[in-house]
């Protein structure tokens, strides 16, 4: 439910600043090709205290593992072990990771295991999208949630006990070539595409390292001439990523989360002259039951029939907002807060202003 406090909180915390500050290149752009790679694998968690899986594939996986160790069970045997869980294991392989380095691993239950707390992940190969093994994972799980149940069926769950982590549980076995040391240029890709930011980035690099060092190919990418010797290229990029650049001011936007009622209004949002009337309709639904009782000795049966009553009422007085030409977001928020409206009211008002053409901003609903 939306409240007046959340509107005020939105006005205080969720307003973008109109002032642009210089930022480092490393905060504005990424180096093309220098990125993490996602890895995934399938494994088993053992040592659970009766909170494991009750699925056929967990049984099958356990039997397959036992067969690899020379323990052959008769066909059709079911282990029915409640201390084992089938899990998906995934991790991010950072750029430039070398063989032998450790990475963190996340483990998620695939079946109906109640909790992974106290479990140990057995050796699991982690593969990339190309099917090659890039890391091996194994270790004791750290689980933030818990699950407890009583003999009478009562149960309590805190957070998510079916997901855990193994810090440093993955060992890199194979490196990924980033192509960082190839070619005569380095490509910088802006995190937020903007022609002004790209131009300012080119100008800042050329001012620092000489004219013609950098040039923009579009609103997102900037090519920088760089030395080919790896040591020199690393030092060169170290200089570039610490150059300060003034980013361009983003276009006027209003972002609305229709599920939570969160509204973010950009600092450049303005409204043309407009008047808005907004009122709330309250729909009330009441359910009751009518009982039809036959007369004494009539031989009939008592009948119970549902009865529904619907009513539509207007809650509160109509709200009138009058905005002069060029009004800013401060005026909008103050006007809505003054009448004690909720974020839901503000959403409806902004949508109506956009439809009328009075709102000079992009309205984005997420």
UniProtKB/Swiss-Prot annotation:
GO biological process: bacterial-type flagellum-dependent cell motility
Keyword hit for Isomerase: no
Main location: periplasm
Signal peptide coordinates: 1-22
GO molecular function annotations of the record: structural molecule activity
Annotated transmembrane regions: none
Localization, UniProt: Periplasm; Bacterial flagellum basal body
Record's keyword annotation contains Signal: yes
Keyword set, alphabetical order: Bacterial flagellum, Periplasm, Signal
Pfam families for this protein: FlgI
CC annotations in GO: bacterial-type flagellum basal body, distal rod, P ring; outer membrane-bounded periplasmic space
Family membership noted in the UniProt record: Belongs to the FlgI family.
Described purpose of this protein according to its UniProt entry: Assembles around the rod to form the L-ring and probably protects the motor/basal body from shearing forces during rotation.
Subunit structure, interactors included: The basal body constitutes a major portion of the flagellar organelle and consists of four rings (L,P,S, and M) mounted on a central rod.
Protein name: Flagellar P-ring protein
Underlying gene: flgI
